[in-house]
């Protein structure tokens, strides 16, 4: 009985451990995606290429994610990965790294670094950085944009009393291959956003900690019940027997009380009947 209980508890521990590991991996995946370098471009979904490999070899493309809303925009670098036929028995291996392109409009991006005084912005580009030409513009509502003198991929902007919008175009051989825009908030707006933003990391850590504690407690309770199943069963049997006996005792008490009260009630009814007869 003990060996069977130990086997069940081991399987239960293994299952809960896998569930906790999956939850932590998903959380880490979200955090990694959020801090990727915005200088990487948005890239389109690549098609598998198998011209250089046998027909039974399948290739998939792994593309870096950029800071724009859609990861199929702009210009970037992708890795062509072979999923079968790799040397040394490896499940995956990189065949080559190549450049890929998607739609020119990359939407609104995020700064690569920012503080209360200044912000650093980055155009969409790939290595080497100097192979492209960059045009920065200051966007103005209902007015023509102002072309800035900066021609590098990085632009450092100081915060002003009013929010500003910037746009960067990446050109390759005088052809626009990517365009991305940024919004620079004022210091007051940034402080308000930071104050109103919930501390998701602290909440996530708290929830995970409570969940782990509850899971460990439940696991120990189940292990205790499985190992001491006979004692638990006897305890439940005694508890149910005691409850049944108490219910029977209460029923007997009620029956005895009703029997004691019934003889005193009968003479009263007889006297009432005789008085009515005499009248």
UniProtKB/Swiss-Prot annotation:
**Hey, which stretches end up on the Cytoplasmic side?**
243-279
| Keywords tagged on the record | Cytoplasmic vesicle, Glycoprotein, Membrane, Phosphoprotein, Signal, Transmembrane, Transmembrane helix
Is-annotated flag, keyword NAD?
A: no
Phosphoserine modification, residue list:
262, 275
Report TM segments: 222-242
Q: Name one GO cellular component term.
A: acrosomal membrane
Q: What does this protein do?
A: Plays a role in acrosome expansion and establishment of normal sperm morphology during spermatogenesis. Important for male fertility.
Q: What is this protein called?
A: Sperm acrosome membrane-associated protein 1
Organism (species): Bos taurus
């Amino acid at each position: 009985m003990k060996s069977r209980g130990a086997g069940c508890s081991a399987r239960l521990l293994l299952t809960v451990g896998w569930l906790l590991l999956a939850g932590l991996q998903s959380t880490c995946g979200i955090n990694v995606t959020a801090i990727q370098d915005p200088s990487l471009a948005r890239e389109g979904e690549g098609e598998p290429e198998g011209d250089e490999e046998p027909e039974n070899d399948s290739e998939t493309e792994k593309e870096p994610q950029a800071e724009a809303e859609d990861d199929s925009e702009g210009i970037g670098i992708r890795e062509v990965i072979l999923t079968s036929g790799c040397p040394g028995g490896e499940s995956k291996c990189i065949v080559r790294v190549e450049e890929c392109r998607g739609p020119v409009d990359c939407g609104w991006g995020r700064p690569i670094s920012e503080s209360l005084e200044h912000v650093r912005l980055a155009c969409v580009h790939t290595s080497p950085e100097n192979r492209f030409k960059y045009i920065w513009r200051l966007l103005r509502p209902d007015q023509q944009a102002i072309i800035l003198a900066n021609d590098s991929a990085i632009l450092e902007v100081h915060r002003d009393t009013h929010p500003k919008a910037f746009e960067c175009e990446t050109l390759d051989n005088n052809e626009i291959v990517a365009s991305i825009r940024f919004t620079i908030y004022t210091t007051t707006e940034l402080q308000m956003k930071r104050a109103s933003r919930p501390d998701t990391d602290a909440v996530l850590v708290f929830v995970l900690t409570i969940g782990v504690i509850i899971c460990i407690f439940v696991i120990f309770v189940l292990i205790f019940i499985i190992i001491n199943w006979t004692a638990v069963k006897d305890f439940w049997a005694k508890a149910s027997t005691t409850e049944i006996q108490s219910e029977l005792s209460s029923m007997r008490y009620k029956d005895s009380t009703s029997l004691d009260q019934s003889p005193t009630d009968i003479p009263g009814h007889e006297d009432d009947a005789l008085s009515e007869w005499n009248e």
